[in-house]
């Protein structure tokens, strides 16, 4: 598998209407894809995309099967 095509864990942090910080985790190739996935799978983020305040790439471990 090409290193550029590997999926990495991303955490998408966002604030709800009460300003409470929440997060969703996704495996994606880059931060933009993680944002797109968050908008697809989280109704609140889809309706309020500017509620995202951080997208962080978490540490990941290569696993060979």
Each model region followed by its residue ranges:
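Short intrinsically disordered terminal tails
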Residues: 1-6, 61-65
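Generic detector of low-complexity/intrinsically disordered segments
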Residues: 8-9, 24, 39, 56
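Short, mixed-charge low-complexity intrinsically disordered segments
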Residues: 39-65
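Short aromatic-glycine-(Arg/Gly/Cys) micro-motifs in beta-strand/loop hairpins
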Residues: 2-22
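A short, exposed loop/beta-hairpin motif centered on an aromatic-Gly-Thr core
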Residues: 20-33
């Amino acid at each position: 598998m090409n290193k550029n095509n590997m999926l990495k864990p991303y955490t998408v942090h966002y604030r709800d209407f009460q300003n409470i910080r929440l997060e969703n985790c996704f495996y994606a190739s880059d931060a933009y894809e993680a944002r797109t996935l968050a908008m697809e799978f989280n109704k609140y983020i889809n309706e309020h995309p500017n509620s995202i305040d951080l997208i962080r790439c978490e540490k990941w471990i290569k696993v060979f099967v």
